[in-house]
A protein has these predicted regions:
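Protein kinase glycine-rich loop
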Residues: 28-34, 39
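Activation segment signature within eukaryotic-like protein kinase domains
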Residues: 128-129
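Protein kinase catalytic-loop region centered on the HRD/HxD motif
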Residues: 132-144
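Conserved short submotifs of the Hanks-type protein kinase catalytic core
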Residues: 95-109, 113
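AlphaC helix of the eukaryotic protein kinase fold
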Residues: 57-78
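A short, aromatic-enriched beta-strand patch in the conserved N-lobe beta-sheet
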Residues: 89-91
Length: 333
């Protein structure tokens, strides 16, 4: 190559995987890609543990870069919740790509579990609903919206716990904003009013939770995109049609009613959510109470109507394994 040849000075940025290898991570393997990042499974050598590292790829625009920082901030404020994925570390590669380190969950997501194994049993879905409603409620108490509650964002741990992940498009009150009218979630799990151009709200997260439970019970989304269907046509069905009746799938009346209400097209009077933003978490709290009561009856049918044995709304969220007590059989299998 001759002197002064432009190829002689051309520089190619190293891959994120290669850079992670120089940041204390070993056995770096790509395990997934999202709208704005790549996820790697790595070994964190200094702590002898396997972790998942989400890296913001260099080719993404500033909007998606800002979205990644929103995830860091939101997830940091929620660290410690038993049903929300924890952040273990944040950093940046030598070329400036930011990353977050999270626990690695080989059990995969709820979406993968349903796709591979079909619908979950009623008691599993009720347990899932109680815990996810508690997770969303906790986020709402901090003024945080998830904006994309769906099966793919619920990870299943080795300890039998569901954990809500990917607050990458979350909104923190007083912080970052998303342009009104921009749909940043997954259409089949996005509230009708958001598809119509309204900004996301706590009620929209309640809708996403209801749509997720519908999918877990039936094996498919209530308004799943049909083969050959245009996205506009799918939007039209979501915004104009009633939610399919879960009783036709053999789901009890009370459970069907809770999910139908959570997925109501009316975000104010239809969903279990008062209009005052100060009490926005009550929407998920009401859903938790309904699901927790039904879950209690499914598990303890002989205790129906025994007064003192009725569970409180938060009881289901407290039924957690002791820290460090590994379960031999996952309830998701």
């Amino acid at each position: 190559m001759g002197e002064g040849d432009p190829l002689d000075t051309q520089r190619y940025p190293p891959s994120p995987a290669a850079e992670l290898g120089g940041s204390g991570f070993a056995d770096v393997q790509e395990i997934g890609r999202g709208g704005f990042g790549v996820v790697y499974r790595c070994t964190q050598e200094d702590l002898d543990r396997t972790v998942a590292v989400k890296v913001l790829t260099v080719e993404l625009d500033e909007e998606n870069r800002a979205r990644f920082f929103r995830e860091q901030r939101a997830m940091g404020r929620l660290t410690g919740h038993p049903n929300i994925v924890n952040i273990l570390q944040v950093g940046a590669t030598d070329s400036g790509c930011p990353y977050i380190v999270m626990p690695y969950h080989p059990q995969n997501s709820l979406e993968a579990r349903v796709r591979e194994g079909g619908p979950l049993a009623l008691d599993q879905v009720l347990r899932l609903g109680v815990k996810m409603a508690g997770a969303v409620e906790s986020a709402h108490r901090l003024g945080i919206l998830h904006r994309d509650v769906k099966p793919a964002n619920i990870l299943l741990t080795d300890y039998g716990e569901p954990e809500l992940a990917d607050f990458g498009i979350a909104h923190i009150s007083g912080g970052f904003e998303t342009a009104t009218g921009a749909v940043t979630g997954s259409p089949a799990y996005t509230a009708p009013e958001v598809l119509g151009g309204d900004p996301p709200s706590p009620a929209a997260d309640v809708y996403g939770l209801g749509a997720t439970l519908f999918s877990a019970l039936t094996g498919h989304a209530a308004f799943e995109r049909r083969s050959g269907e245009q996205v506009v046509a799918q939007f039209l069905r979501i915004t104009t049609q009633e939610v399919p009746d879960l009783r036709e799938h053999g789901i009890p009346d009370d459970v069907s009613a809770v999910i139908a209400r959570a997925m109501s097209r009316d975000p104010i009077s239809g969903r279990p959510l008062p209009p005052t933003s100060g009490n926005s978490y009550e929407g998920c709290n009401a859903t938790t109470a309904s699901l927790s009561t039904r879950w209690h009856f499914v598990r303890n049918p002989m205790r129906r109507g025994t007064g003192s044995n009725r569970p409180r709304a938060a009881d289901g969220c407290r039924s957690l394994p002791r820290r460090g007590a590994r379960r031999d059989v996952s309830p998701w299998n």
